[in-house]
């Protein structure tokens, strides 16, 4: 039976792109006033959508409305300020213990207001404009990020550190990520890029467009997507894939107990079995961190590079030999795979954005 494979791919794909969700109907209820304190010093910041917000100089009660932003807050060491996040914020494991405010596309304004945040973090690609406007109506500032490339993710991390008034942490994290990417490019220098198909969904077959940060991450790993589409999440036919004949199929399941053998069922399916990559079992299976615009994406890039170009990792390059083993930001390099807290059952299309 190939059903388990479909569930594996579907589980990862549910987090990538969204259908139109129902209108936000939650309204904030009366909540008890927070304890009286001295007024916080305020200043203006500009988010990545060009919006000017007035926020505390030192935000201390933060709510994250996206898993990627929750991970970034932890990477910066500011998790003690995180007073709430979404049902999908599952990493690092401690994030699951934070008070929940609902989903990514349908958070509860009542629950958000009850936590008295002085800053809410949102991302343009996953959260809804209606949510941001509703927060504004309740005078709750919402800082938005909008990364499109891996470099943008690193820059967003550093900007968020500035917003949280911990610029040194942002510089440490950004420098570590940049150093690791530079070392990786040194390893891959001169090697031909592997032509890959990043599989988001099998039925229908959906991949990633050339303008997404996922496609950029593939490039950093010594790969190039065979899908040259301006759409972010294009649907493609098996006939087109058969014509393109990728060297590897890349999967990013959301749980750790997945191995190449779990994809062997592809060889029994019409359309798939005519692909050279399927016949040769050329599958790259990496962490779903690759679909989260957060610092951990670099770990997923490194893992993909190891699978596509094992010959490049026989000997560490000179710059890696010189790097100290106790790099200041190394603490946030999480394992390659995420433990899943969800079942393998199919989800609705409205949940597809939720793991971003």
Residue ranges and their predicted role:
Residues 86, 211-234, 253:
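His/Asp/Glu-enriched short active-site or ligand-binding loop at hydrolase and phosphoryl-transfer sites
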Residues 66, 124-125, 200, 230-233, ...:
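Short secondary-structure boundary segments
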Residues 51-52, 118-119, 129-206, 224-229, ...:
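Extracytoplasmic substrate-binding proteins
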Residues 1-7:
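N-terminal secretory signal peptides that target proteins for export/translocation
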């Amino acid at each position: 039976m190939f059903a388990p494979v479909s569930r594996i791919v579907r589980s990862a794909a549910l987090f990538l792109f969204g259908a139109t969700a129902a209108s936000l109907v939650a309204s904030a209820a009366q909540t008890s006033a927070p304890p009286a304190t001295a007024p916080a010093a305020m200043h203006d910041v500009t988010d990545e959508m060009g919006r000017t917000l007035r926020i505390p100089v030192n935000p201390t009660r933060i709510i994250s409305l996206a898993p990627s932003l929750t991970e970034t807050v932890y990477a910066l060491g500011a998790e003690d300020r995180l007073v709430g996040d979404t049902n999908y914020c599952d990493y690092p494991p401690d994030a699951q213990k934070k008070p929940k405010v609902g989903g990514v596309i349908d958070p509860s304004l009542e629950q958000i207001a009850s936590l008295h945040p002085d800053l809410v973090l949102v991302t343009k690609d996953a959260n809804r404009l209606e949510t941001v406007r509703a927060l504004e109506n309740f005078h709750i500032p919402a800082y938005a990020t909008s990364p499109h490339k891996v470099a943008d993710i690193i820059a967003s991390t550093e900007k968020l550190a500035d917003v949280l008034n911990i610029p040194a942490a942002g510089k440490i994290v950004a420098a570590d990520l940049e150093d690791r990417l530079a070392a990786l490019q040194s390893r891959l220098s001169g090697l031909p890029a592997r032509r890959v198909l990043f599989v988001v969904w099998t039925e229908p077959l959906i991949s990633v467009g050339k303008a997404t940060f996922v496609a950029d991450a593939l490039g950093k790993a010594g790969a190039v997507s065979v899908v040259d589409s301006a759409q972010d999440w294009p649907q493609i036919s098996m006939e087109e894939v058969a014509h393109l004949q990728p060297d590897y199929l890349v999967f990013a399941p959301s749980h750790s107990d997945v191995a190449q053998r779990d994809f062997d069922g592809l060889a029994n399916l019409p359309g798939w079995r005519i692909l050279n990559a399927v016949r040769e079992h050329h599958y790259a299976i990496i962490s779903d961190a690759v679909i989260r615009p957060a610092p951990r994406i670099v770990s997923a890039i490194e893992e993909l590079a190891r699978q596509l170009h094992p010959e490049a990792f026989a000997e560490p390059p000179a710059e890696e030999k010189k790097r100290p083993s106790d790099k200041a930001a190394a603490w946030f390099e999480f394992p390659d795979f995420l433990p899943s807290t969800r079942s393998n059952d199919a989800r609705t299309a409205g949940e597809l954005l939720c793991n971003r």
